[in-house]
Each structure stands twice: as structure tokens, then as C-alpha cells.
């Protein structure tokens, strides 16, 4: 059985079948949601039978990330399989720059296949548009696993004053606006992320610019700011990055998570909502 599996792995058709199965499954999930299949997590590692491989689909652009030495050796077959399932004109980006690759003895690199120099693309999710820097944004570009959480925020945001902390590209905040939030404050330490939020607001939410505040600052520093503490919010969203990189970090980082939740709770009105995601 082991020899048969190894033989299959050396065959492009093995990867074609896995990708086709994953695509078919997602087509069923998004059957009644226009355009959602064009922007989704196409391959989610072992969940789709391909451990060590993540592929995010941005219409005709496929952002891939390999994290294991075993999967790395099949990179060329992955490219061939994607072209076979879709077409030869697709663009493929390998974002193989995660530090975890070093644990497998792998180099860190990025590679573009049939991709032009235009980094900014328009992503569609839950019927909304977002600008994404496909080559330079975190991980594979977008956190598709938060799709339902983004929509949940929209469903409860009506007439609420919202704080979107660790906002990244604004997935939660712009959904809050789509849900008719009274006001949304975006906060992120990354100047690049803040710039993209601003460009997304200008491009797709110009009619709601008076409801938008954008702050480029470290979230914990802002929450401790005396002037900022004069404000209160109906809904506070905390979606921090993965602070814990290894077991030795657990103790100190857990303190940061607890402090973050306590600080954020100060800003909630009575009967306000604090939504923490990690």
C-alpha cells in the first residue's frame, strides 16, 4: 500500500483528483452564493488530503503555501495540476516565506508564475469588495477562514459604534459598515494594512467615509491611551495575529491575550459586545 501511495504521489493525476474533489465540495457549499467560489480557500492542507499545502483562490490567481519538505518536492506537479483543472493562463504565486519552513530545513522564498507586476487585486467576499496586495500581504493574502465571522459581524452591526482592532485589511470593519454600523474605527500597527484599508474605503465605501476612522498604531498602546479611553463602543472586535510561535512563548503571550481582553472590555458600553477571535 505504501509503494502504491508513493507511486500515485509522483503522478500529476493524484493532485488533479485532489483539487477537483476540493473544488466540487466548495461548489456545493457556495451553490447559492454568486462569485464566492471564485474567492475561497481551495486547498486546506490535510482537510483536503494534501498536508502541508494551502491554496487560496483569487479568481484566476492562485496563492500557494507549502510548509513541509514532503510537499515541497511535488511543487511542479501542483503547478501542472492547477493548470489542468483550470487553464494554462492562470497565475500562480508561491508564498513559501513562513518561518515554520525552517523547521523542515526548507529555504524561504516567493515565486511568481505567469503573474504580472500588479500587486493589488480586488477580492469579493460576502458580496463586498476589498483590495488585497496579493504578493505582500500576510500569509496567502486573505483569511478566508473568517468568512462566516465577517458576516456575523455584519448581521449584528446595525446602528452600532464599532472598534475593529488588529483590523488587517478590514474584513470585520467593512462588514460592519455593510450592516449599517453607526461608526467604525479601524486600528492596525501595519502601515501597509492601514493604507489598503484607506484605499478600499476610497474605492468601494466612499459614500460612508464619514462613518470611518482609521488609526495606524499598536493596538495595546492605543487601548492604554488616556485620550482614547474617553471613548466607548457597542462592539469591540479583537482579531490578533498568532503571538505564540513556540511553547516557550505561552506564559508571557497568554498574559498579553488576557490584558488585551481586559483593556478592550473597558471600551464596551453597558450591554456592549466584545468579540475575540484567535
Locate each region found by the language model:
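Non-catalytic accessory regions of SAM-dependent methyltransferases
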Residues: 1-59
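Short amphipathic alpha-helical segments
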Residues: 11-18, 70, 74-78
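A short, charged
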Residues: 14-17, 21-33, 87-104, 154-181, ...
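A short coil-to-beta-strand element that immediately follows conserved catalytic motifs
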Residues: 36-38, 91-94, 212-213
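Non-catalytic substrate-recognition/targeting regions of SAM-dependent transferases
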Residues: 45-56, 72-142, 151
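A short interface-forming secondary-structure element
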Residues: 59-72
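Rossmann-like S-adenosyl-L-methionine
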Residues: 113-278
Amino acid at each position: 500500500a505504501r509503494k502504491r501511495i508513493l507511486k500515485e504521489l509522483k503522478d500529476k493525476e493524484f493532485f488533479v483528483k485532489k483539487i477537483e474533489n476540493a473544488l466540487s465540495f466548495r461548489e456545493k457549499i457556495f451553490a447559492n452564493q454568486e462569485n464566492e467560489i471564485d474567492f475561497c480557500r481551495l486547498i486546506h492542507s490535510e482537510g483536503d488530503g494534501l498536508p502541508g499545502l494551502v491554496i487560496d483562490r483569487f479568481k484566476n490567481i492562485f496563492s500557494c503555501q507549502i510548509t513541509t519538505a514532503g510537499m515541497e518536492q511535488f511543487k511542479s506537479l501542483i503547478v501542472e495540476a492547477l493548470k489542468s483543472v483550470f487553464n494554462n493562463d492562470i497565475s500562480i504565486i508561491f508564498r513559501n516565506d513562513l518561518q515554520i519552513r525552517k523547521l523542515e530545513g526548507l529555504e524561504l522564498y516567493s515565486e511568481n508564475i505567469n503573474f504580472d507586476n500588479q500587486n493589488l487585486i480586488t477580492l469579493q467576499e460576502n458580496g463586498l469588495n476589498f483590495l488585497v496586495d496579493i504578493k505582500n500581504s500576510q500569509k496567502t493574502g486573505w483569511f478566508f477562514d473568517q468568512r462566516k465571522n465577517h458576516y456575523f459581524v455584519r448581521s449584528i452591526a446595525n446602528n452600532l459604534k464599532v472598534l475593529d482592532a488588529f483590523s488587517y485589511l478590514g474584513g470585520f470593519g467593512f462588514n460592519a459598515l455593510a450592516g449599517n454600523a453607526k461608526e467604525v474605527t479601524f486600528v492596525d500597527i501595519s502601515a501597509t494594512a492601514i493604507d489598503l484599508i484607506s484605499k478600499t474605503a476610497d474605492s468601494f465605501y466612499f459614500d460612508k467615509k464619514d462613518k470611518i476612522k482609521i488609526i495606524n498604531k499598536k493596538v495595546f498602546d492605543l487601548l492604554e491611551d488616556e485620550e482614547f479611553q474617553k471613548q466607548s463602543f457597542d462592539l469591540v472586535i479583537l482579531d490578533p495575529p498568532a503571538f505564540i510561535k513556540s511553547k516557550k512563548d505561552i506564559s508571557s503571550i497568554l498574559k498579553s491575550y488576557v490584558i488585551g481582553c481586559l483593556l478592550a472590555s473597558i471600551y464596551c458600553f453597558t450591554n456592549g459586545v466584545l468579540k475575540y477571535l484567535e
